């Protein structure tokens, strides 16, 4: 893990919140001139602390108003089965997150879709393509209370 000082952490916090901030403004906010601030950002990119910059898109503007979480429990478990599941999930653009978890089920899937009919089709396709029988439990989101990608840097 790279060593990060107070200024690095402040840079990371600011860029997570506003990735298009100019180096001049970023430098002013962290107490550096533009050149040293740019050098720090490039170092953080080289060290893969900063892994990319992304536009935050309103899913409603694209008609993707349905957000669903799905628990998937596989009937059998092995490394090859987990790899097969990974390959199938990676080819499903509606699935925006998928996590192999510990606990009473195996995968937690987050999907963003336009309508319930799309979800029904996605779930049927997913369960059909899995290498072993599986059970699923779905949770349709009624309200997104908090949706943040900001990794807290306080206390580091």
Report each predicted region and the residues it spans.
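A compositional/biophysical signature of low hydrophobicity enriched in polar/charged and small residues
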Residues: 1-156
